Amino acid sequence: MSVSLVLCTWGGAARTARVYRVVKQAMIRTMFVRLRSAGQVRYQSSFSFPSSQSLLQKGQLGKKKRSVRKLGLGISDKKQYNSGVTSAAQEAGGAVRDLKSEKAQTKKKVYDYSTLPRVEQISDTKLKNMSTEVLYSGYRPLFFDVEPKNSQEGKTLYEFAMKLEEFQEAMSPWVSSATGSEMYAEWDNVPGDVIKDLKPFTPPVVNSRKLNGATGENANDFDEQGNFQKKAFFDKVQSILNRNGKGGRKRPGVTVLKHLKKLKEQN
């Protein structure tokens, strides 16, 4: 009633009726909305803004862009701001990349061996053939089984192979190398008896009398003279060492060396 009186005083009758209808409709709408909201139950979901990482990143990115626009920064400053924003996204995606890398490492690696040389198959190779080849090649057989295999003579095959070395002749050191792996072909034309009798060269002992040309009685005289000189030399050395400081400033060692040099010159 009060609203209608105010409207009547404000304008004409037609205008008052039109405004009254608009106000009435607005009041009816508000009452209807209130009644409708009072009769409904609002269900709140577990999804919220702080729990969503993507929404947080978008919000941070928007804040950074707005702050850059307000401050009017340059290109370099914008790059720094963008790098700070993207670092948060990189940290969030780091966990996902770690999981992917772990899965990639756990996968079985496939190697390509096509470039390597191929080896012949050993499906057709037998142990008997290998043992026979090793036996006749000159080496001690290593592929025989340890289990006893009796032959016609009642001896094992392993003992027979070990006794083959007893019948083998001792190899001359001139024919082969020290390890026996290399044979010298220049000895093929030399008879075996000659090779057996060969001995290493030992230089003969040369007598000092023959070097000086002394023979017969002169040789004996030469020996006596040498012994006399040696005896005289040792007597002289002994007398020098027994002087006990009576020789003045002379050094006994120098005197002995001089006598030794003189003896060598005489011989």
From Swiss-Prot:
InterPro entries listed in its UniProt record: Pet20-like
Keyword annotations of the record: Mitochondrion, Transit peptide
Subcellular location: Mitochondrion
GO biological process: aerobic respiration
GO CC term (a single one): mitochondrion
Main location: mitochondrion
Region (Disordered): 243-267
Transit peptide extent on chain: 1-44
Stated role: Required for respiratory growth, stability of the mitochondrial genome and for proper assembly or maintenance of mitochondrial proteins.
Name of the protein in question: Protein PET20, mitochondrial
Taxonomic lineage from the root: Eukaryota, Fungi, Dikarya, Ascomycota, Saccharomycotina
Name of the gene: PET20
